[in-house]
């Protein structure tokens, strides 16, 4: 049964145990009530999620039924906090047989004014995918195993040889404003792409994206997060012809790890996107997730890349650092590629300046900082 802010009574003996419990609960409370302090999510009135939720709108969940009930419950004027414990299998152990079945059972819609926070390093969502389509959402300290579509579709027009494509991303931010994604780990997890076999002469791809921001989404910060073992990672802007995106898709990603990511780290259309102090690790010859490119510069994008570090074997120039997908505005400052300073700027001016305060680390400090602090369980 779902219980708002319910804690199981414990028979405590000894002042030390009581003290430790008090400290733990205090730290946990601070995590759940934090608001965004960096990047684009601080603008437009800020991102508060459910930080001011009333006690009866704070839920602790440990299975799919409780999670879905907490998301569906009335949040009140100050929203809700959902504290996620352990591994939640959204399928309840019943494998999805069709894409339509997955759409019905795996989708997790996040209401506005919601904070979702993992209570420990073991907090993880499997066999499900989040949709944030309402404003003011915070997700922190959580691992999301990227969803596995049981029915990939063959598209003979995708690329020179055709490709298999699938539905559903680990998290989709669609049309929502003010979203903060912090210390979240996205990974293919138990189902890496080398397990899928081939058909029509091409790898059969059961994954789509890890994190997509699209359809007029705005004021989004991704901080100290991890993207690991995935092909098409982070899309910002889903179409060259989406006019609702004009003037929107303002996104910051900082101090995050991209490890064995083939592409889209991120791939941007239209948006004013600030990428700083991120660490990319990989290889162009990786057997499962070879690096094709790091950042994709798409139509109308205005990317400011700053003091990022790319340790990707096989990269020697800018074509795989900032790949041309129809864009023309790209500025880089102080980034390192395999230990060397490299200037990959296409433009001296990008037409905008970050309106928020921030202090980027020197590039030679980035790898250690990201290793120590990024991802679920390091908050």
UniProtKB/Swiss-Prot annotation:
> Gene for this protein?
pelP
Q: What is the lineage of its organism?
A: Bacteria, Pseudomonadati, Pseudomonadota, Gammaproteobacteria, Pseudomonadales
| Family to which the UniProt record says this protein belongs | Belongs to the polysaccharide lyase 1 family.
> What's the protein called, per UniProt?
Pectate lyase
A single Gene Ontology molecular function, please? Answer: pectate lyase activity
- One annotated GO biological process: pectin catabolic process
Q: Which Gene3D superfamilies does this entry report, sorted A to Z?
A: Single-stranded right-handed beta-helix, Pectin lyase-like
Which PANTHER family does UniProt cross-reference here? PECTATE LYASE 18-RELATED, PECTATE LYASE 21-RELATED
Listed Pfam families = Pectate_lyase_4 (PF00544)
Domain of life, per lineage: Bacteria
Q: Where does Ca(2+) bind?
A: 169, 208, 212
Write out the GO cellular component annotations. extracellular region
Protein location: Secreted
Question: What function is annotated for this protein?
Answer: Plays a role in bacterial invasion of plants.
- Signal as UniProt keyword: yes
Q: Which reaction does it catalyse?
A: Eliminative cleavage of (1->4)-alpha-D-galacturonan to give oligosaccharides with 4-deoxy-alpha-D-galact-4-enuronosyl groups at their non-reducing ends
Q: How is the cofactor bound?
A: Binds 1 Ca(2+) ion per subunit.
Q: Active-site positions, per UniProt?
A: 264
Q: What keywords are annotated for this sequence in UniProt?
A: Calcium, Lyase, Metal-binding, Secreted, Signal
Q: InterPro entries, from UniProt?
A: Pec_lyase, Pectin_lyas_fold, Pectin_lyase_fold/virulence, PEL
Q: Where is this region: Disordered?
A: 190-209
The pathway noted for it is:
Glycan metabolism; pectin degradation; 2-dehydro-3-deoxy-D-gluconate from pectin: step 2/5
What is the annotated signal peptide range for this record?
Answer: 1-29
What cofactor(s) does the depicted protein rely on?
A: Ca(2+)
Instruction: Give its E.C. classification number.
Output: 4.2.2.2
């Amino acid at each position: 049964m779902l219980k708002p802010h319910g804690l199981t009574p414990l028979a405590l003996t000894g002042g030390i145990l009581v003290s430790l419990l008090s400290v733990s609960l205090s730290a946990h409370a601070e995590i759940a009530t934090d608001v965004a302090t960096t990047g684009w999510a601080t603008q437009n009135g800020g991102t508060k999620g459910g930080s001011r939720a009333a006690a009866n709108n704070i839920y602790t969940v440990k299975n799919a039924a409780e999670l879905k009930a907490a998301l569906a419950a009335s949040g009140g004027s100050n929203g809700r906090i959902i504290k996620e414990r352990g591994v939640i299998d959204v399928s309840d152990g019943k494998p999805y047989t069709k894409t339509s079945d997955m759409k019905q059972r795996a989708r997790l819609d996040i209401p506005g004014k919601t904070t979702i926070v993992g209570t420990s390093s073991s907090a993880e969502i499997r066999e499900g995918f989040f949709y944030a389509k309402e404003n003011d959402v915070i997700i922190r300290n959580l691992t999301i195993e990227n969803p596995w579509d049981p029915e990939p579709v063959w598209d003979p027009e995708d690329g020179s040889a055709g490709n298999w494509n699938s539905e559903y991303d680990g998290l989709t931010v669609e049309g929502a404003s003010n979203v903060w994604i912090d210390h979240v780990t996205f990974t293919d997890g138990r189902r890496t792409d080398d397990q899928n076999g081939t058909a029509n002469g091409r790898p059969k791809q059961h994954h789509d994206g890890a994190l997509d921001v699209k359809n007029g989404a705005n004021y989004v910060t991704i901080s100290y997060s991890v993207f690991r073992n995935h092909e098409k990672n982070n899309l910002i802007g889903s179409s060259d012809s989406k006019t609702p995106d004009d003037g929107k898709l303002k996104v910051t990603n900082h101090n995050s790890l991209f490890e064995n990511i083939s592409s889209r780290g991120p791939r941007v259309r239209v948006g004013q996107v600030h990428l700083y102090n991120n660490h990319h690790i990989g290889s162009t010859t990786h057997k499962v997730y070879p690096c094709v490119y790091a950042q994709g510069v798409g139509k109308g994008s205005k990317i400011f890349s700053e003091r990022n570090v790319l340790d990707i074997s096989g990269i020697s120039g800018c074509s795989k650092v900032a790949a041309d997908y129809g864009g023309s505005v790209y500025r880089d400052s102080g980034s390192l590629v395999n230990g060397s300073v490299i200037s990959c700027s296409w433009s001296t001016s990008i037409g905008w300046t970050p309106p928020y305060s921030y202090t980027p680390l020197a590039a030679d400090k980035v790898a250690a900082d990201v290793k120590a602090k990024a991802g679920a369980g390091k908050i």
